[in-house]
Amino acid sequence: MVLNHIRAARTISRIELAAESGVTPATITQVVRELMDHGLVVEVGRGASTGGKPRTLLQLNPRARYAVGVLFERNTCVVVLVDLTGRPVARTSFPGTAPLPPGQGVALVASRVNALLDTAGVDRGKVLGVGLATYGPQDRRAGVLLTHQPTPEWFGYPVAPRLSEILGLPVLLDNDAAAAAIGEYWLGAVDTPAFGCIYMASGIGGGVVVDGELYRGSSSNGVEIGHITVDLDGGPCGCGNYGCLGNYADPTAVIKQALEASPLGARLGLDPGDTDVMAAFGRIATAAQAGDPAARTLIERSARHLGTAAVTMTSLFDLDTIVLAGPSLAAAGPIYQSVVQEEVRRRTFARRAHPVRVVTSVSGSDAAAIGGAVLVLQGELAVLELASTTSPRESAGKPAERAGHRR
């Protein structure tokens, strides 16, 4: 696909594009001309001379199309608008939807999306859709959550169809960790064809990308690394399993441990009745990075458990890179990165065959939201290219019918 090759290269000449795509130079010239006529591709100067005439460079036109990404969390929500290259151009955040019934929660998200689009001043006709990145389990095709979190009312609620109905835009539901992984790939955070992503917000999840595509499993609920069993005699988890890694390493677990260490909990002003998990965890993470020994001990313990998750992922999929993403990991990124890297170095099965590097997300707390928008773009590039090279020019600017939920 020509558009995707241009996107991946950032800037590329027609000759290079023909070589990388396997399409003849004559066909590339024709396709590029049509893509330029539709405003999707622009010329951006010339490359360095290699002895002959410098080659004209191409890139995607960032302002040709846009996509919205939403991190839909119990304690925090983030909305981003990205251009055709996946670069964020506008952002907003607000408290999560945990206290609200589903209808009100979705309506709140829709109002914030509309407000962001109005503030950004983009032509809504250029907005391809919305990627809704959230926790699971979920039925991605139906656009519904299959969990009683945060309340039983949310189970089976048509989150994506309802949001699409309000916005009048296609809405794609996907796992937050999977979205974060593909977002990192698109933004060039990793230079390897296969890598894993460990994502931590209020819970822990994972995503694996192979050759630019997400590993989906049978129902797109795979790589739930927070629900691997790390203690056969451990307590019950909300997922129905016992001894899950999340019970020992996620923000709720860390907060519980801090409260049990009464001097630390009191010193940080932690309240057992506080439902804002992200804010409470953020206080512990900030204290750990500031050198508080008790707080650092808790964060390092959580990080060692995530190291087990990273070792499991690398051994299962033979990965050479693990990305740490999500708002909770961003809060104490250097500590988590250092500890997880050491665990992987010591324990990965193929450590004598190749090193495994652990890096932090380039998108920080917004990784899942940006990834949600990227998933929309990823699904649309082929549609845009087909429409541009087979349709009359009058159709330019009209988004094609797309997969996903729409009104």
Residue ranges of model-derived segments:
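Short, acidic, Ser/Thr-enriched surface-loop or helix-capping motifs
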Residues: 83, 140, 209
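Glycine-rich phosphate-binding loop and adjoining helix at the ATP-binding site
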Residues: 88-194, 335-346
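Glycine-rich phosphate-binding loop of actin/hexokinase-like ATP-binding domains
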Residues: 191-249, 397, 401
